[in-house]
């Protein structure tokens, strides 16, 4: 890939090749909020992939920004065409990250951030080089509190996600980095430092 990105963390305009970063977490750990913070601070350097899903949009979600909301038939057609680098069927819903979506971001000369579930993250890393980051709540009790505070999901959905979180947390050791989101600002600074370290490794070999 010939397109390079100017490091947002460098004062001297250091350039490096754009890279794929995968961020995963149990529902309620804060991965979406932390990713949005990174994009707001560095809009020219980072861009999130837009995953496809068959679930309905939640209040405030925008098609083409948060997700590509598609029918189950359309999703299965994409599967038949082998459009996805990774896909999962979770909680009765299909989710997938397409090859075209990752290429779209990287070819713009931006670091690509894929915010996906743990199963998809580990599958995607087998397909192409990536830095994997796991966001974790400080405790299971805090994760449950955050999930219960959500108004966008029904009680049985929250229960399903909480039960599934144990499986996801058990896979944290398979990731390159683990960030504990106890305090949002502190967690963001840790996440930011990971990107600085990875850019330094890319820039200086």
Curated annotation (Swiss-Prot):
Keywords: ATP-binding, Cytoplasm, Kinase, Nucleotide-binding, Transferase. Residues 18-196 form the Guanylate kinase-like domain. Its main location: cytoplasm. Its EC number is 2.7.4.8. Pfam families: Guanylate_kin. ATP binds at residues 25-32. It is an enzyme of class 2 (transferase). It catalyses: GMP + ATP = GDP + ADP. GO terms for cellular component: cytosol. Belongs to the guanylate kinase family. This is Guanylate kinase. It comes from Chlamydia trachomatis serovar D (strain ATCC VR-885 / DSM 19411 / UW-3/Cx).
């Amino acid at each position: 890939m010939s397109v390079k990105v100017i490091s947002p963390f460098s004062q001297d305009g250091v350039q490096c090749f754009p890279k794929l970063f995968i961020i995963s977490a149990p529902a309620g750990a804060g991965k979406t909020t932390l990713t949005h913070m990174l994009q707001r601070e560095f809009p020219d350097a980072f861009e999130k992939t837009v995953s496809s899903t068959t679930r309905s949009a939640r209040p405030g979600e925008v098609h083409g920004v948060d997700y590509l909301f598609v029918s189950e038939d359309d999703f299965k057609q994409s599967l038949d065409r082998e459009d996805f680098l990774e896909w999962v069927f979770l909680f009765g819903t299909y989710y997938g990250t397409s090859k075209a979506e990752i290429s779209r971001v990287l070819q713009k000369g931006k670091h690509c951030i894929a915010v996906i579930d743990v199963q998809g993250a580990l599958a995607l890393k087998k397909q192409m080089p990536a830095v994997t980051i796991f966001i974790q709540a400080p405790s299971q009790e805090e994760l449950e509190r955050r999930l219960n505070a959500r108004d966008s999901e029904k009680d049985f959905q929250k229960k399903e996600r909480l039960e599934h979180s144990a499986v996801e947390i058990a896979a944290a050791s398979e990731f390159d980095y683990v960030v504990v989101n106890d305090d949002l600002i502190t967690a963001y600074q840790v996440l930011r430092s990971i990107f600085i370290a990875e850019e330094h490794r890319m820039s200086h070999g």
